[in-house]
Amino acid sequence: MIFQSYLLIAASMFCIGLYGLLTSRNVVRVLMSLELLLNAVNLNLLTFSNFVDSHEMKGQVLALFVIALAAAEAAIGLAIILSIYRNQRTVDPEQFNLLKW
């Protein structure tokens, strides 16, 4: 029963993150939704690692690796968003035209 509840929580987190990723018009919300997606993946990794083969540490190691990548992605993403906000005065992705000719 606990296994299914963890998977249900991870699936709901993933769906909420995907909804926020697809519908948000604010780049900060998109970044937060992406982090929620990665946390749902981590919860799935840890759940399967714990319940399928509790003696192997592969799921935990991969989850730590994903957490480290998510932290780097958040830092770089926020730095880019801050730079764009200073230049454009908006965080609406429809208004970004930095790469257009």
From Swiss-Prot:
<comment type="similarity">
    <text>Belongs to the complex I subunit 4L family.</text>
</comment>
<comment type="subunit">
    <text>NDH is composed of at least 16 different subunits, 5 of which are encoded in the nucleus.</text>
</comment>
<dbReference type="GO" id="GO:0030964">
    <property type="term" value="C:NADH dehydrogenase complex"/>
</dbReference>
<keyword id="KW-0813">Transport</keyword>
<dbReference type="GO" id="GO:0019684">
    <property type="term" value="P:photosynthesis, light reaction"/>
</dbReference>
<keyword id="KW-0934">Plastid</keyword>
<dbReference type="InterPro" id="IPR001133">
    <property type="entry name" value="NADH_UbQ_OxRdtase_chain4L/K"/>
</dbReference>
<feature type="transmembrane region" description="Helical">
    <location>
        <begin position="2"/>
        <end position="22"/>
    </location>
</feature>
<dbReference type="GO" id="GO:0016655">
    <property type="term" value="F:oxidoreductase activity, acting on NAD(P)H, quinone or similar compound as acceptor"/>
</dbReference>
<keyword id="KW-0521">NADP</keyword>
<keyword id="KW-0150">Chloroplast</keyword>
<dbReference type="GO" id="GO:0009535">
    <property type="term" value="C:chloroplast thylakoid membrane"/>
</dbReference>
<keyword id="KW-0793">Thylakoid</keyword>
<keyword id="KW-0812">Transmembrane</keyword>
<keyword id="KW-0874">Quinone</keyword>
<dbReference type="GO" id="GO:0048038">
    <property type="term" value="F:quinone binding"/>
</dbReference>
<keyword id="KW-0618">Plastoquinone</keyword>
<keyword id="KW-0520">NAD</keyword>
<dbReference type="GO" id="GO:0042773">
    <property type="term" value="P:ATP synthesis coupled electron transport"/>
</dbReference>
<keyword id="KW-1133">Transmembrane helix</keyword>
<comment type="function">
    <text>NDH shuttles electrons from NAD(P)H:plastoquinone, via FMN and iron-sulfur (Fe-S) centers, to quinones in the photosynthetic chain and possibly in a chloroplast respiratory chain. The immediate electron acceptor for the enzyme in this species is believed to be plastoquinone. Couples the redox reaction to proton translocation, and thus conserves the redox energy in a proton gradient.</text>
</comment>
<feature type="transmembrane region" description="Helical">
    <location>
        <begin position="32"/>
        <end position="52"/>
    </location>
</feature>
<protein>
    <recommendedName>
        <fullName>NAD(P)H-quinone oxidoreductase subunit 4L, chloroplastic</fullName>
        <ecNumber>7.1.1.-</ecNumber>
    </recommendedName>
</protein>
<dbReference type="InterPro" id="IPR039428">
    <property type="entry name" value="NUOK/Mnh_C1-like"/>
</dbReference>
<keyword id="KW-0472">Membrane</keyword>
<keyword id="KW-1278">Translocase</keyword>
<feature type="transmembrane region" description="Helical">
    <location>
        <begin position="61"/>
        <end position="81"/>
    </location>
</feature>
<dbReference type="Pfam" id="PF00420">
    <property type="entry name" value="Oxidored_q2"/>
</dbReference>
